[in-house]
Amino acid sequence: MAKPQHGNISSNHKKKALTACVSSLICLGVSHAALAAHPTITPQTLHALTVLPDNEKLRIGDRISQVEDDINRLLPQLTLKEKVSLVHAAGKFHIPAIERLGIHEMWMSDGPHGVRYEIDRNSWAPAGWTNDYSTYLPPLTAIAASWDLNMATLHGNVLGAEARHRNKDLILGPGVNLARLPLYGRNFEYMGEDPFLAASLVVPEIKAIQANDVGATVKHYALNTQELNRTKVNAKPDERTLREVYLPAFEAAVKQANVHAIMGAYNEFRGTNANQSKHLVNTILKGEWGFQGVLLTDWNVDINTYDAAMNGLDIEMGTDVADFDDYFMAKPLLEMLNAGKVPVSVLDDKVRRILRVQLSIGMMDKHRLSGERNTQAHRDDARTLAANGIVLLKNDNKVLPLHADKLKHVLVLGPNADKRHGFGGGSSEVKALYEISPLAGLKAKLGDKVDIQLMRPASSQFMPIPNDYLTTRHWTGTPSWQINYYNDNKMTQLASESWIADPQFNAKGQKQFVDIKANIKPIETGSHSFNIKADGQVALYINDTQLIASTQANQGHVISKAMTLTAGETYAVSLRYQGDKQATLGWETPNSLYNTEQEYLAAAKKADAVIYFGGLSHADDRESIDRPDMVLPGQQDEVIAKLLKVNPNTVVFMIGGSAVEMPWADNAKAVVWGWYGGMEAGNAYADMLLGNQNPSGKMPITLPKKLTDTAPIALNDYNATESVYSEGVFIGYRWFEQQNIAPLFAFGHGLSYSQFDYSNIRLSSADIANNDMTNDDIAGNDTITVTVDVTNTSKVDGAEVVQLYLHDVKASVPRPAKELKGFDKLWLKAGETKTASFTLTQRDLSFWDVNTNNWLAESGQFEVMIGASVADIRLRKRFDYQHKAKP
């Protein structure tokens, strides 16, 4: 059976933890002064930044100093079979115990933004627990948008504390793959497109997780930048691109945060699976970086026993093989060990690493922390995190903030107005006690004094069945459609099950056999027309009776069939689809749920404020698929354009984890990007819209005007077989700068209700000199400090993210026009001036030299650029660097 839940943390243990917390701020780089200047951190949320430092862990059982001694004591007592049992799964999410030695089962959980609901011990089915709810935090894109190390700490601490309370040993996050492709289905899980930003934020995130006696698992190592054929696509970047762009966040996780675990990627790397790549694992990760933790696979990876064992894989996790002893790292490994094909010393190294992790997080320590979960403080933290990630993209004529005392009637529209997102996205889905929708947040904020009207614009094109009528519930309690995937066209061999928010499916060019089903309950009696728009073979069943016979559908033609439904009765609806394209199920009710164009435009003209909550959902942003394009789903562009024409002050509030095209952007006065905001999203959005929270987020990704402006598409380097990363080091904004392409909204862009002035840039020296670096030398032997004064020239308190970009003026290799090398978030009262400070190291000046296989900073001039975004540079200054070769 699954492990029991922890009860409430004891008062004695809590007192001990809180006492230890007093000194932890400095250890995590969060000073008391920084907290005092941070307006969104209150006494109620302060606890989440005060996590146990390493010196407190030493005090509790003197754990860290004993780890290696305990490993040396335990390892010789293990039999060969016991050692092998530890390097592969014994269930869907755990490796086994060796109870005679006090080695317990090590349990893992998905959850980069909330601990996932409990999975059955040996299958993918939900365990059906009633006490596995967790706090649903904003995903890491929102944390990246905060550009705030404190927010990464806050996020990591809540995640770690809740994982510990759920009795988990490893949390499978954070993710640090870069947003190379806007279509990538998992961009929302990661930290944006820039290697420096991701590397900077992942360190405090990991430290905070692990301070809770839980191991963080950084993923996916490496180059998992598309879901299209993700288990087979061959990533083939050149070495310089690999080192400068796609590895720095992993390197920081190892060297600066001492992360306990790393999860390998699904994809191949230069012809072999990334989990068994000698170059990635033994040479770089465990060799150059000195990683002491464990490398574990993702679930269902394509490896072989010998290469995986010899090239550094430590744990093979879940597959579809029924018998865990048949895993590649189980019986086949034992046979190779007995035959002498794999040395026992190789296995011993893996077991040492596993024991090191278990001992380091206190799995054999009676003083191990117990954590806490679903507390009011954690809900406050979720709201704080959501608020700090909101990005104000456009605010002409100061349309925002809205003034509550001037509002009598507010019109709310858009597919995300009352949608909840926590249950979707794939492995990152969270079972939360509740989730505040944007509509609910506005109603809670404005109360009964303001009339808030929700309207659903009808489209001139096809509309899916809305979830208002669903009685089927995802186990999180959210109205949802179940989707079953089959291996055969007779649809008898079930492959997997999942859930989607709407009855629409995109096979992304891969032949699929799916059954999309839910129970619906009409609210009126009469003729209901079921409509199917698809490319492929479709059939529709109502209560297991075929309403639309199996037929070949064409996307240009809608197949319709009407039947009489009775109000209050439940009907089982099943859409079966076979094909490699798309299918959507819609309907028309006797009195349509949707408002006509005439109705919603008339309401928009009269309203005191119009807010359109659009964007994406986890039907679009989710694991296992990429989007087909950057177009907003559901004809949103059409509706937004019409709203802006009749009411130019319409606020367009986008929710989603990846870039979308916005052809109406020039006509919009107010555009906001809110990401997926977690369980407190609606409250945080309302705070920002009504001026109770001054937006301070900045874009961690570039928002292109069109998909063809992006490097992978422009260079035809996005396909199912291989990606050579043709753009090289010119990822994201670097590509746009190099190609002189104007984006829709630039990397680092984000407005405030305040205004800020930059002045007085200063360098600690006009020139620096340095010697050759080794692979282990990050900082070099000298640094240069850059400072700049920032003044809040407005009458509104606010925060500004000051960004430092660097350029090697004359380099021997192509280098970006701007590379992010520093950022500093300043909280400024109205009229206040503060100084932003940055330290540049030799590594910051360097590129990866393929000739010497090392970092190289060339002599010459470097230009420092200080700005509010990559496209809004306010100050510039140059310095000289002199490289001195070692004698």
List PLM regions with ranges.
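Short amphipathic alpha-helical "recognition" segments used for binding
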Residues: G7-I9, L18-A20, R166, L223, ...
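Acidic/polar hotspots within intrinsically disordered regions
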Residues: H6, N775-D776
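Glycoside hydrolase catalytic-domain context in secreted enzymes
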Residues: A37-I768, D772, I778-F847, N854-L856, ...
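Gram-negative bacterial Sec-dependent N-terminal signal peptides
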Residues: M1-L35
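Short beta-strand elements
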Residues: D872-P887
